Each structure stands twice: as structure tokens, then as C-alpha cells.
Regions:
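Conserved Walker A/P-loop ATP-binding site and its immediately adjacent core
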Residues: 13-35
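Conserved beta-strand elements of the Class I
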Residues: 8, 15-17, 218-222
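ATPase catalytic-site recognition across NTP-hydrolyzing enzymes
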Residues: 97, 147-222
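Inter-Walker segment of RecA-like/P-loop motor cores
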Residues: 27-80
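Walker B beta-strand of ABC/ABC-like P-loop ATPase nucleotide-binding domains
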Residues: 82-83, 221
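Catalytic glutamate of the conserved HExxH
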Residues: 86
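Walker A/P-loop NTP-binding motif
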Residues: 1-12
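ASCE P-loop NTPase helicase motor core
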Residues: 35-39, 43-45, 89-165
Length: 224
């Protein structure tokens, strides 16, 4: 929120979109930004043209929109910063539709920034984005905030939190574990040891990860 506010105040005529899995969550984030704005020194504040639960417009021409993440959320607009909150909780098909709709707008601006923030929720589209970012396969920069970096949180706090919730919930919400956030037949530890790789070839829906080796025996398992 602080970065978005700084960007809007110190840059003229910029458009910022705050999108979340629910419209109420996006409006809550905008509300925090508005509260931060009210606490800025008077010399730093711009004149306000629009101030409501869904949008903010400053005298320097900068605008901030709050809405739910959908394919039509920012269609037709031009944005300098798009902030996506709790992106892992967006259904896969909506996330795919969103980027298919918005990416032309994102790629048209040389300085357009996309900030994706989320708690892990299993091995879904957000996991794929994060894993690819770690391996340098996309242009995102992975940044993890561990619970121990928050002032006042220590081992005692950890033990109390686990006692009041569960170890699995703690791993997901605070340890940023992608596995364990969904119930699986196979243990999380085993799944975590597996590696996600891109296929070496794709052909009409057939993904090939390894070339067959001559005179080797292979076993095929099919889940129907």
C-alpha cells in the first residue's frame, strides 16, 4: 500500500489498479491507502478530485481503482501499476482469462509494473508463476516475507499460533508452503520433493518430458 501511495503522489497522471479475489478485499486495501494518505504531511498531500470506496483521483491526475479480479476488471484501460492481491485464490480459469485480457495492456507500456501478492494455495497457477520466477523463466522477481521478519514474532509466538490453529495452517499462512494447503492422498513431504519441469516437446496436446531410451521397459499408469 505504501508503494502504491508513493507512486501515485510523486508521479503525475498514472493509473493504478488494486485487484483482489473479492471486491470487498480490494476496497479494504484502497481504504488502507486512503488512511495512509490522510496521515501524510500536508505539504505532501495532493488535492483530491474523487474519493470513495471504489476509486481515488488526485489533483495531479493520478487515479487508483479497486475491483475484483476478472477478465473485464481493467479491460480497455491503460495502467501503470496493477496490484493483484491473494491471486492464488482466484480460480485457474479466471486467472487465465484475466491475463489473456490484460496482458496486451501490460506489454504495451515499457514501465508497467505487475505486483502479485498471495498466500499459497496448493500447486495452482500462482505456484507455477512463483516456481518459474525462481528459475528465471519469467520476468517476475520472487520476494518472500517470512513471519520471523515481523517485529514481535518469535518462537513463543509460533508455538502459541500452532496451538490455537494447526501446524498445517501455520505452514501455509506463515511459512509460505505451497504444499499442505490442500488435502492430498500423497504426503506433502513427498510432493514437495517432486520437481516441476516444462516438457521438452509439445504436439497436439501431447507433452513429452523425456525421449524414450532404446531397449528400456516402460510402465504406463492412467488415472480415469
Amino acid at each position: 500500500v505504501s508503494y502504491l501511495l508513493h507512486y501515485a503522489v510523486f508521479n503525475d497522471n498514472v493509473n493504478i489498479a488494486i485487484l483482489a479475489n473479492k471486491a470487498s478485499t480490494a476496497r479494504d486495501l484502497l481504504g488502507r491507502l486512503q488512511l495512509a494518505y490522510e496521515n501524510l504531511p500536508k505539504w505532501m498531500q495532493q488535492g483530491v478530485l474523487v474519493w470513495n470506496k471504489g476509486s481515488l483521483e488526485l489533483e495531479n491526475g493520478s487515479k487508483i481503482l479497486a475491483a475484483s479480479t476478472s477478465a473485464s476488471a481493467v479491460r480497455g484501460g491503460s495502467y501503470n501499476v496493477i496490484f493483484l492481491d491473494e491471486f492464488a485464490f482466484i480460480p485457474n480459469h479466471i486467472a487465465d482469462q484475466f491475463f489473456a485480457s490484460v496482458y496486451p495492456t501490460i506489454s504495451s507500456g515499457q514501465k508497467t509494473k505487475v505486483i502479485v501478492v498471495s498466500t499459497p494455495r496448493g500447486m495452482n497457477h500462482f505456484y507455477r508463476m512463483w516456481h518459474d520466477a525462481e528459475r528465471g523463466k519469467n520476468e517476475y522477481i520472487p520476494t518472500e516475507v517470512h513471519w520471523s521478519e515481523v517485529p514481535g514474532r518469535d518462537s513463543v509466538w509460533k508455538e502459541q499460533t500452532i496451538a490455537n490453529t494447526s501446524e498445517q495452517q501455520f505452514r501455509v499462512e506463515f511459512e509460505c508452503e505451497f504444499l499442505g494447503s490442500v488435502d492430498t492422498l500423497i504426503s506433502s513431504a513427498k510432493l514437495k520433493s517432486l520437481v516441476y519441469d516444462e516438457p521438452i516437446k509439445r504436439n497436439a496436446g501431447l507433452d513429452i518430458y523425456f525421449e524414450p531410451i532404446k531397449n528400456h521397459d516402460y510402465v504406463l499408469t492412467v488415472d480415469v
